[in-house]
């Protein structure tokens, strides 16, 4: 319903890597290097100030074949927005900024800031032509003053991986940047491959 998904095909050993990027703190280049090494596509959900401050990284994401999705311009609590005009402005402002930065069109994938949404939001996103992308596997990786150890991250992420998983990671996490190479290797050894989030919406 409302063209939203949190899970891929559970009959396939395929997983979907997604990164939420509210700001840049020096981890993204390493993450992109690791994704390139593994030939792993990912989706990056970006906000306005991220694109404004890091145009080179955003262009690199696009050039290296990753999906860039809409995390709204201001990263507000969108559940408080019930008017289409304001909702549209949040998404279309980011579309324009991305177009000006990369010369490309932003992919029509939306992730609500902080995962907070109303049913009305999902309906409005759909009316604007967006697929809403949630997730089925995440862990507390966004606290800068309380980053998980590598061991804690592995313990959360490796046993809980599953067929069709949409994995939410934050690109601001030093732990994620440090472990990503070995994490992807481990998942590959378990028989998983990495898919494009467009596969979550086979009809469209």
Q: Predicted regions span which residues?
A:
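Active-site beta->alpha N-cap acidic-glycine motif
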Residues: 1-82, 86, 90-100, 106-107, ...
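Solvent-exposed coil/turn segments that connect beta secondary-structure elements
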Residues: 49, 73, 115, 172-174
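Short secondary-structure boundary segments
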Residues: 114, 136-137, 170-171, 198-199
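Structured helix-beta-strand junction loops
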Residues: 38, 64-65, 128, 163-164, ...
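Alpha-helical scaffold elements lining the catalytic groove of polysaccharide deacetylases
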Residues: 25-27, 76-102, 116-163, 176-178
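Conserved, mostly hydrophobic/aromatic
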Residues: 20, 35, 44, 68-71, ...
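Low-complexity, Gly/Ser/Thr/Pro-rich intrinsically disordered linker/tail segments
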Residues: 173, 185-204
């Amino acid at each position: 319903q409302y063209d939203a998904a949190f899970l891929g095909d559970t009959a396939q050993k395929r997983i979907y890597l997604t990164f939420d990027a509210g700001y840049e703190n020096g981890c993204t280049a390493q993450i992109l290097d690791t994704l390139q090494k593994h030939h792993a596509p990912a989706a990056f959900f970006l906000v306005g100030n991220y694109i404004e401050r890091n145009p080179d990284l955003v262009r690199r994401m696009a050039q290296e074949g990753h999906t860039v999705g809409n995390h709204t311009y201001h990263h507000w609590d969108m559940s408080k927005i019930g008017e289409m005009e304001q909702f549209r402005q949040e998404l279309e402002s980011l579309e324009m900024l991305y177009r000006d930065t990369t010369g490309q069109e932003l992919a029509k994938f939306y992730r609500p800031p902080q995962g907070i949404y109303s049913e009305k939001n999902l309906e409005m996103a759909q009316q604007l032509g967006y697929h809403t992308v949630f997730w089925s596997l995440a862990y507390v990786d966004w606290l800068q003053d309380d980053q998980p150890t590598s061991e804690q991250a592995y313990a959360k992420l490796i046993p809980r991986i599953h067929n069709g998983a949409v994995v939410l990671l934050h690109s601001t996490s030093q732990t994620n940047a440090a472990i990503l190479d070995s994490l992807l290797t481990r998942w590959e050894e378990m028989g998983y491959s990495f898919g494009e989030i467009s596969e979550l919406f086979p009809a469209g």
